[in-house]
Amino acid sequence: MRQENSSRLTKWREPLPTELRSASVVLSERDLSTTMPVPLHGRCDQVFDNGRFLYVVDTKRRKKPAVYLRDVIQLSVYRVILERESQRLIGYHRSVSPTGYVRVTGYGTTSYLQVKLLTTTQVVALWNRYWELKTRKAAANPRVAVVQVCSACDQAPRCPRYQY
């Protein structure tokens, strides 16, 4: 019975990207954090090491394979944390790839979608903007008002685009 189960497992494969085929998973479902360059934290689904770079991977369950800006930001935050904290988290320092992957599962299929990650400077700029809005030192100024987003925003009463 044991051999039967293990043979079924060895036949199951996902269409891994080239960079990940020979890589090892060094972190899985792990909380990550850093205080530098700004305080950041998150829970990364997987981090792969192919001997040259660390690759961040986050799994999303979706009807269609798609990447959203929030996915890129999330993976980029993990990249910034790992650049600073890989020694502490995995026991050695390794550069983090400027690309990551969104692993999209749904309806019996799995796809790995490559994304270009934001730089540390861009992540810090987003962090600063978030806190400017949160502490009301800046006003929101979206290009377009989106009802689903704007109705939950605490900046809506002061926003020039929100008129619902």
Per-segment meaning from a language model:
Residues 40-65, 76-78:
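Conserved catalytic cores of phosphodiester-cleaving nucleases, focusing on short active-site segments
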Residues 23-41, 84-164:
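Metal-dependent nuclease catalytic regions and adjoining charged, substrate-binding loops involved
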